[in-house]
């Protein structure tokens, strides 16, 4: 039997992690498989021949995309030509939908099987993208169950594979060990997580610090920990903290340790809320956008919730305080009872964790190999 040739394209670090896990699982069933495409250091370490550095696809923000648009379009065109000539057994686009969905469509039209791993947020907004997905994608692999239900309703072949974070984060995190590792004392501890991007931090950090000062008055002895997403964010946060006297420990990265160590979390809506959920830490979710952006999104977004815990629970499991509702007083008062309580939240989190814990990389590999008729049956 000829060796399998699988093409993969990832556009950012999170996709590189998922891609590497998937490649390991594919190699377990087909040790001689060949991998071509675009990926980062983790995928290359698993044997991917990357046609160009993944960083060339890692662009955030409209202005940056426009500045690189000519290069991105040229790279995509060349990639389409190369992969059509190479004729892999299957192509897997990992996240990066603005780049990979068109790639999948062109390759499928050329007779190559296509898989998309990680659903874009079509269930929330720009739902017409599902038409392109249905036309260009033989199989959608979703990390979350409500995404799979959406695609089933839209007639897109789909498999819910679970989330790799749910596989790696323990069902019960050791709070005492995490505090010891961070050198934090006993007593009430709140994690402040105002986001990873400069704009988010600029809009939320000062509000979070004001809320923390109110919490100090409401719960004497409370301390705070804030994991900084990058050196740039740390500088920004230190500037915003000038003149304040909060009992706050800043960390460089280490968000998982901060979550394991804390009793409750004040957090910006985003992927970090899933991490807080998996660590079973009660949370209050807040978000502020530029007023015009909020006005536009309010009219475009189809979902009643914005935070992943509520989307996963399909109910209001965690408080969401958005825009003008995200005042320091409201945040402090909502968070206060969760520091020593929050059992309803944590019970819901445990149920969700068990649902997402499915050995995602092996599930994804099985789905890909079944699609192309190459699944090895267990002996």
From Swiss-Prot:
Q: Which UniProt keywords are given for this protein, alphabetically ordered?
A: Glycosyltransferase, Lipid A biosynthesis, Lipid biosynthesis, Lipid metabolism, Transferase
**Broadest EC class?**
transferase
- What domain of life? Bacteria
The record's section on Pfam families has: LpxB
**Transmembrane portions of the chain:** none
Q: Give the EC number.
A: 2.4.1.182
Q: Which GO terms describe its molecular function?
A: lipid-A-disaccharide synthase activity; phospholipid binding
Pathway given for this chain reads: Bacterial outer membrane biogenesis; LPS lipid A biosynthesis
> Could you provide one GO biological process annotation from this protein's UniProt record?
lipid A biosynthetic process
Q: Which reaction does it catalyse?
A: a lipid X + a UDP-2-N,3-O-bis[(3R)-3-hydroxyacyl]-alpha-D-glucosamine = a lipid A disaccharide + UDP + H(+)
Provide the function of this protein: Condensation of UDP-2,3-diacylglucosamine and 2,3-diacylglucosamine-1-phosphate to form lipid A disaccharide, a precursor of lipid A, a phosphorylated glycolipid that anchors the lipopolysaccharide to the outer membrane of the cell.
Q: Which NCBIfam families match?
A: lpxB
Report the family membership: Belongs to the LpxB family.
Q: What is this protein called?
A: Lipid-A-disaccharide synthase
Source species of the chain: Pseudomonas fluorescens (strain SBW25)
Q: Gene of origin?
A: lpxB
């Amino acid at each position: 039997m000829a060796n399998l040739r699988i093409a993969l394209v990832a556009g950012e670090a999170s996709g590189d992690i998922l891609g590497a896990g998937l490649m390991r699982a594919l190699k377990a069933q087909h040790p001689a498989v060949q991998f071509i495409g675009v990926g980062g250091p983790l995928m290359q370490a698993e044997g991917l021949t990357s046609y160009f550095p993944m960083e060339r696809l890692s662009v955030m923000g409209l202005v940056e995309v426009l500045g690189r648009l000519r290069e991105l379009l040229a790279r995509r065109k060349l990639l389409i030509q190369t992969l059509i000539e190479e004729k892999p057994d299957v192509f897997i686009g990992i996240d990066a939908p603005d780049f990979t969905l068109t790639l999948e469509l062109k390759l499928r039209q050329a007779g190559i099987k296509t898989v998309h791993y990680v659903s874009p947020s079509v269930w929330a907004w720009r739902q017409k993208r599902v038409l392109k997905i249905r036309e260009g994608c033989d199989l959608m692999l979703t990390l979350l169950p409500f995404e799979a239900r959406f695609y089933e309703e839209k007639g897109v072949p789909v498999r819910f594979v679970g989330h790799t974070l749910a596989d790696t984060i323990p069902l019960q995190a050791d709070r005492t060990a995490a505090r010891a590792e961070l050198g934090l004392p006993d007593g009430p501890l709140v994690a402040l997580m105002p986001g990873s991007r400069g704009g988010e931090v600029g809009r939320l950090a000062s509000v979070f610090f004001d809320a923390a000062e109110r919490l100090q008055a409401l719960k004497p002895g409370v301390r705070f920990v804030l994991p900084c997403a990058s050196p740039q964010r740390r500088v920004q946060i230190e500037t915003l903290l000038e003149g304040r006297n909060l009992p706050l420990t800043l960390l460089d990265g280490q968000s998982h340790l901060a979550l394991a160590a804390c009793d409750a979390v004040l957090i910006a809506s985003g992927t970090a809320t899933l991490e807080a959920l998996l660590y079973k830490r009660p949370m209050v979710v807040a978000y502020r956008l530029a007023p015009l952006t909020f006005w536009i999104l309010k009219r475009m977004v189809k979902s009643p919730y914005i935070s992943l815990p509520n989307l996963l629970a399909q109910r209001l499991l965690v408080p969401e305080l958005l825009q003008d509702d995200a005042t320091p007083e409201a945040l402090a008062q909502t968070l206060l009872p969760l520091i020593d309580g929050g059992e309803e939240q944590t019970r819901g989190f445990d149920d969700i964790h068990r649902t997402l814990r499915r050995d995602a990389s092996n599930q994804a590999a099985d789905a890909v190999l079944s699609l192309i008729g190459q699944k090895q049956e267990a002996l």
